[in-house]
Amino acid sequence: MRRVAALLAAAALVAGIAGCGGGGAEPGAPRGATLVLDFQPNAVHSGIYAAQANGDFRDAGLNLRIQEPSSTADSAKLLETGRADFAVMDVNDFGIARERGLDLVAIAAIVQRPLASVIARNPGEIRTPADLAGKNIGVTGVPSDDAVLDTVLRSGGVDPSSVHRVTIGFNAVADLAAGQVDAATAFWNAEGVELQRKGIPVREFRVDQFGAPRYPELVVAVARRNCSEAGALLDGLRKGYAALTLDPRAALGDLLDQVTGLDRGSQEAQLAALESARAFVPADGGAASPALAPEDGRAWLGWATRRGLVKRSSAARIAAGFGASGGCR
């Protein structure tokens, strides 16, 4: 009995030691982490899913879980409360979160140029932004829509107050197809592609071709307190984007394999549009890359302050959130 008791005590001691720290994880084992997306998975996220499929995040020390958001407001909240480690955010949402006082840092770019546009039906009638004067234009109700629309209108010498804005939510495809509006703010890589696939003639006015600078539409953000974890995520992303460059169709296949319910034809068309626009390639050229140049973030900030999306008094606070790729500062 005494021997049995001693063995049981020793076993309990070993179990207690093993249970202390790291939740029982073995030394050197990948650390669990969560990346929240900006929207439901789609072709724009192909580099992320390629890295996940190839084990690049695990090799970098992360057991990464990719999480879909329940709303576009999720990302900042989850980072703020510590319920997510990383988040893909629209750069406009990132800037507004910084303005609100959240200490987030942008460490990578998922795409390297704006995806926002004004899409018009009846391209025979609407050839330039000047032709939008007096038209009914749909907006989602998101603040950045007004900044995008005003920029495109002003590029054609149109007074923004001369158009009739209609809040249509995220129904641009249906409302443009039905002729409910003459034009709408929408993403050219998503709604623009779907309209073309439906055979509806449209004209796109991409915001960086009509008055806005080139800036990264989507960034990866981290709470500054978690900056030490950024390097591992970036290592995985770089390899994922290298795979995307080497074989885009295989990267898209990784997305489709991991996310059920996506339409292959739609996603192939979206990826083709992104590649044609070199949306994954930094402004200085080269191959697809998640590298985020701080000056690209500042280019967005200059435009956003001019259009009233964020206050000029918040510019310094927001600018401090655009850290160089590879680390936080």
Predicted feature locations:
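Bacterial N-terminal signal peptides that target proteins for export
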Residues: 1-8
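Bacterial N-terminal signal peptides
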Residues: 8-17
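Bacterial signal peptide processing site
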Residues: 18-24
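Short, glycine-/small- and polar/acidic-enriched structural segments
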Residues: 26-168, 173-178, 182-189, 205-206, ...
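Pocket-lining segment of extracytoplasmic ligand-binding domains
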Residues: 92, 171-263
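Surface-exposed patches in mature extracellular/periplasmic domains of secreted proteins
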Residues: 106, 164-165, 244-255, 313-316
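Secondary-structure end/capping motifs
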Residues: 228-307
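Conserved C-terminal helix/tail region of periplasmic/extracytoplasmic solute-binding proteins
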Residues: 297-329
